[in-house]
Amino acid sequence: MVKKEKNSDKYIPELEEKIIDLSLKLKSKSNELNAAIETNSKILGKLTHNLKNPVGVIFSFSEMILEDLEDYSAEKLGKHMQIIKNSATFSLAFLDTISKYTRVNSPNYSLKTERINYSELVNSVIIDFKVKAFEKNIGLEMNFSSKEIFLTLDRDEITQALSTVLNNALRYSNENSTVNISVEETKNTVETAITDQGIGISDADLPRVFDEFYVVNTYSADKQKCIGLGLAIAKKIIEKHKGKISANSILEKGSRFKIILPVISV
């Protein structure tokens, strides 16, 4: 019996250590679960809040049209159908953004990297926004240190991040202004800067521009309602590539967003 007690005494510290380790792991998992629940609750709240109005608009105007279709003029019908279309477009865009946000925050989120010409990728993103820039008479200036800058990236994800930043630059820019896009290669990084002459961001709002669901201005310079997830998604994508994104701004003067990507593979 004495021998058994000695053996028991020997294993007690090991057992205590295992229990403590298990407790810490359980606490960590509990914190992760609580964070996930909080995030999901926030998403659900935003879904309800942001979709309630446009869905209500679609229902109301559809009901009006169905009840009085015979009395509708072509002009009135066209106006009401446009309102329905705008509400549906916003709803679909919002759901798409929520889907992207959920994807980049998933534990299974991964990149499909390939060796690409980054200069060409940035140029293709700029081309996609030329029509929008033209509609607001905004000039797009490009300054690339080289036409051939090769990086190992996920093409679709980086395109998404760049598109978000450039879209915001155009959205918050006034008409007859300029947006500058520069790409500069250094020894270990590639720096992309997108600078606009728009409405700018206040010192109070600037530290929170990458926060989830944070909207600096409810309406942009072109009166488009914002969701507040685009830059948060872009930040996740850039950081997944081991990069950094930052913002500087002067209210009523404009903003400058800088994306730094490593030359090394991710």
Predicted regions mapped to residue ranges:
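Primarily the dimerization/phosphotransfer
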Residues: N31-I65, E70
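Short conserved segment of the HATPase_c
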Residues: I201-V215
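Short alpha-helical segment of the dimerization/phosphotransfer core of two-component systems
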Residues: N86-S91
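Short alpha-helical Gxxx[C/S/T] motif in the catalytic ATP-binding
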Residues: G230, A234
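Conserved glycine-rich
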Residues: K242-G243
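Conserved catalytic submotifs in the C-terminal HATPase_c
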Residues: K112-N117, F134, G139-I149
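Conserved micro-motifs of the catalytic ATP-binding
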Residues: S106-L111, F150-L153
